[in-house]
């Protein structure tokens, strides 16, 4: 018998642990990805289940952390020396790139989960050497432990970097909780190579929901589109990508000009000297990547972007020098030592005006990126730059506010912000709602109001659909939307196709009448908001439908929502929240019918639902008749508006044979196998609960004869969860 040792991987003994092993989605690429509904569970979180980060952060000596960060900025380490003796530029870039992945179309990305620590972000080409920034922060993270998350620390480090170089920031709010595994729900693009750009169609139209121009970039290619040094074309890319972060032209100029006031870029030699990124590097590198074989590999020999740019004469000081330099010279193309396109003053003007990052005896001329020259070339950006030069205080305020917005955009309302550095001013992009300034309804009021709603002539489908439309606008990604604020009665939500505007207006008018009658009859200032009444009315509909099925249930209700005004609502940035499809309502815009099942999973993930919660909600909402346009698709019951498990029972009935309908795309007909008569009609979303093996397993749970009570209980729990998704006041 051979005693020769062999690698166990070669024989496939541990193939299930190899990244290259084929998984189910390799065999069946079109399979639904339900994994995104179960990420970030307690099973991957090393902290105890009752860990309360908000309480830990509130007990933190934030002044001490800030003091330590200030000291870090100028304590250069030999293993990664500080440019100009100050790490400020590096930490600004780290914070910017942590926050800058946010995109408005689905609210994903951003700084609020500390995702830069994990793949793919930790290994993106645009994040080269930010692994070093996080390692520099590690002693501070180690010192304060669980009292400050990586997510908060990275943004705070960016703020302190700015402050330490003389800039006054707008404020800082803590409260970002770390995740412990990569985010599986984010579509970063279709490309399979770094810096690929298969995300365009037509005249360079960037696909939704993507926010960057190429795979692995935060925003734009600093050399210009695909490395083409065309400033006007670069300006177009800049405007598009920053708009996808909800930044206007003024905010865009302020961020670029303000950020490039500090530090430098690194391109000492060609990229051939740079090793693999952290996720691909050897084990002895211990999570670091991009090992550089040129010279010392660090300091003056560092290679990051391949560009070798120092923008200003004062790269560790806040001043007007970036704009003064940009407009102080005429610029011409040149190349960095790494061969990347960048710009220098014509005629070698400005020689000796810019310091060397490591040798006090050396001086250089300033240089710029194509994306910098774009600010001067584009007429709108140019006008803003000149205005900022004439009004330095306006410029500083614009940068402070834009930086605050950039780094806090995905945190939700200001009520979630923690710590003594939170500014008092509430801004429109934080989706403000009025504070409760009245006595709330009590249990007796709630019962009386539900009775009034049920006697109003409004149907169960109307009540349920309206509450669902309001609450399900919530996105767990950036904590926007939801029932609080009653924005369903405002632009743009009141006119969204999925909300059936004409029908919605009738329901809201009835509910407003009930609200006014109740509030007018109260003594002492007790009131119910329309936002509360919309949810309460939906609850009343669910309870009435459950009662028809023989179940006496009470749906939990917590008053305390208030009604926002149109002036408190940033209509343009709410527009991307409009659902393209909502499988819970059996709704899909024309042309998206075939993708409806995938979009259901995406919607469920944004609603923070698990697969069982999604399943029970779909089945229950079909029974309640909550379909868009009163469609009968998926209403597999002879007793509509009754909270039964009939959807699951009849979906799994083998006496029904399904076939595609010839009437419309994405529609199906269920016929009696014996008679051939049509029994039911369905959408792809309906049938996927019988087709997909995981969803069928869940459907079977709710189709059994002993599941009726569990079905109602689980539906009420999942319904209540959705109604309260934006009630951050209840979760403190």
Curated annotation (Swiss-Prot):
The keyword Glycoprotein does not apply. Keywords: Heme, Hydrogen peroxide, Iron, Metal-binding, Oxidoreductase, Peroxidase, Signal. It catalyses: H2O2 + AH2 = A + 2 H2O; 2 H2O2 = O2 + 2 H2O. The record marks 93 as: Transition state stabilizer. The keyword Chaperone does not apply. There is a cross-link at residues 96-219 (Tryptophyl-tyrosyl-methioninium (Trp-Tyr) (with M-245)). Its cofactor is heme b. GO terms for molecular function: catalase activity; heme binding; metal ion binding. The active site is at 97 (proton acceptor). PROSITE patterns: PEROXIDASE_1, PEROXIDASE_2, PEROXIDASE_4. There is a cross-link at residues 219-245 (Tryptophyl-tyrosyl-methioninium (Tyr-Met) (with W-96)). HAMAP family: Catal_peroxid. Belongs to the peroxidase family. Peroxidase/catalase subfamily. This is Catalase-peroxidase. The gene is katG.
